[in-house]
Amino acid sequence: MEYDYRADYTYDASGMGRLHRKGAPETICLSTPGTDTPRYKINVENAIPFAVAPELKVDGKWLSGADRDAVHKIQKHSAGKESATAEISCTWQDKHQVVTDYQLDKNGMKITVSGKGEVGLMIPAFTFDGKEKTVISNSGRTLTIRYRGWECRWELQQGKISDTGKTGYNRNGHYRIFRAENNDTLTAVIRIERQK
């Protein structure tokens, strides 16, 4: 797991930009965040900056932790032999804030976003590497990306997952941007496993 809290937007975006599992394709969850102003070009228009990032709905508009004006601060973190945790605040316009708790262990990554009102979590779903396409399914509570014999599964404990209709890209390929959302608190668990 890697979290960028001061992104260089010519290259990437702030938020969790990397989650790998040994043996799985690096890109199945996310290997590097994406920017809306890359130095490289791929045939995707109107791309947005993306990462696994908290979001907050204010006055009918979603504020994203991947946006340039979001300020991320590490509140606490720890890492052991078999687990790691981090608590990170994300603030917009010095007044709107969410706190995100990340817990990583052998069972996957648990992410909890807490704030006032509608909170969200940006989910970049890998779609195309230039040669192969992934298979994506969304039940509203579980989003699954299948690729090269593996699957990345995002499961919500409450709320819903929906397609934002937005896209992004990085040096690894194309992404469809989904959002998990709920009131006040949202918990998602990410698991990367071999397909059954």
Regions found by a protein language model. Give the residues of each.
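Beta-strand-rich recognition/accessory modules
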Residues: 118, 122-127, 139-140, 146-196
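Generic recognition of long tandem-repeat/solenoid scaffolds
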Residues: 19, 84-91, 111, 143-146, ...
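Catalytic and substrate-binding regions of extracellular carbohydrate-active enzymes
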Residues: 1-120
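Intrinsic disorder/low-complexity signal
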Residues: 3, 7, 11, 25, ...
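Hydrophobic alpha-helical positions that pack around
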Residues: 134-136
